Structures are given as structure tokens and as C-alpha cells.
Amino acid sequence: MVNAEDLFINLAKSLLGDDVIDVLRVLLEKGTEMTDEEIANQLNIKVNDVRKKLNLLEEQGFVSYRKTRDKDSGWFIYYWKPNIDQINEILLNRKRLILDKLKSRLEYEKNNTFFICPQDNSRYSFEEAFENEFKCLKCGSQLTYYDTEKIKSFLEQKIRQIEEEIDKETKLGANKSH
């Protein structure tokens, strides 16, 4: 069975790539707040590289920080911690982003007419096809009308599915907080 930390790391890896995982692992293993300098020392990498990774992780909600001012130098010190308890919210936000992209794509499919090359399946909008005299740019074949009903139907089904998931997960989250 996959534990929460593995799931958290795999999610970060799928959204941000392998580069940030070393920093996330150190924070998870430590279990308490760490400064960027402590992380850099433990990983033996530059503090600036750690900061870049922390900022990427923070943008997606994987880590958060609190800052204090050093009394001697006047510089800010950032204390970072993993937000493993926010994994459901991170997933929910990702689904919302995907939903927005699917809705945009559906609008694009609904608002445009398409043509396709029967030889290589290159797809062209009406404007592109018109500019090229309804000939394929790659092979010169005559383009044919492309019916997007299957694509629109698929997109609509995926949109409904994700909306239902978001709705269900939002209700579950609201019930947990009571």
C-alpha cells in the first residue's frame, strides 16, 4: 500500500518533475521546519538552487513558509515545511485547472470548423484550410470536412466527470471540517 508521503512525492514529481523531489524529501524526512540554508547544506547544493525549488513547490501548494527577521543582520529568514495535509486541496486545484482547459478546448471545438487531410490526418481550422486552398500543407492532398461531434461528446463527458469529482470532493472536504 502506498503511504501518504509517497503519494505526495509522486504528485509533486508528476506536476513539477524530478528536480524538486530532493528538497521535498529532506523536508518530509526532517518533519519540522527548515531554512533554505539548512536544506542546501544537507543536500550539498547552492542555496539559490534550493530557493528556486522551494518557490516552485510553494506555487503548487506543496510547501509553505513563515518568515522572521534576523535581529543581527536585519535579513529575513524563511522557515519551510511540507504541506502534506494539503494533498487533497492540491489535487482538487489540479482538477480545476484541467477542467478549465477542457472547457476552453470544448469552446474552441464548438466555435470552429475543421478540415482534415485523408493521407496524414493533419487537422486544419477553416481559416487555415481556406488560406491553403483546402490542400494539405505537408502532402498537397485535398482536405475533407472533419466532424468534431465525437471530440465534443468526449470533452463534454470528461467535463461532467471532473465536475462531479470536484463537487463530490468539495462536499467531502466541507463535511470533514464540521
Curated annotation (Swiss-Prot):
Transmembrane segments: none
Biological-process GO terms, alphabetical: regulation of DNA-templated transcription; transcription initiation at RNA polymerase II promoter
Gene3D superfamilies membership: Winged helix-like DNA-binding domain superfamily/Winged helix DNA-binding domain
SMART domains, sorted: TFIIE
Pfam families tied to this protein: TFIIE_alpha
UniProt entry tagged with the keyword Membrane: no
Key words, A-Z: DNA-binding, Transcription, Transcription regulation
GO molecular function: DNA binding
SUPFAM superfamilies noted in UniProt: Winged helix' DNA-binding domain
Subunit note: Monomer. Interaction with RNA polymerase subunits RpoF and RpoE is necessary for Tfe stimulatory transcription activity. Able to interact with Tbp and RNA polymerase in the absence of DNA promoter. Interacts both with the preinitiation and elongation complexes.
Family: Belongs to the TFE family.
Note on domains (UniProt): The winged helix domain is involved in binding to DNA in the preinitiation complex.
Record function comment: Transcription factor that plays a role in the activation of archaeal genes transcribed by RNA polymerase. Facilitates transcription initiation by enhancing TATA-box recognition by TATA-box-binding protein (Tbp), and transcription factor B (Tfb) and RNA polymerase recruitment. Not absolutely required for transcription in vitro, but particularly important in cases where Tbp or Tfb function is not optimal. It dynamically alters the nucleic acid-binding properties of RNA polymerases by stabilizing the initiation complex and destabilizing elongation complexes.
Protein name (record): Transcription factor E
Organism: Saccharolobus islandicus (strain L.S.2.15 / Lassen #1)
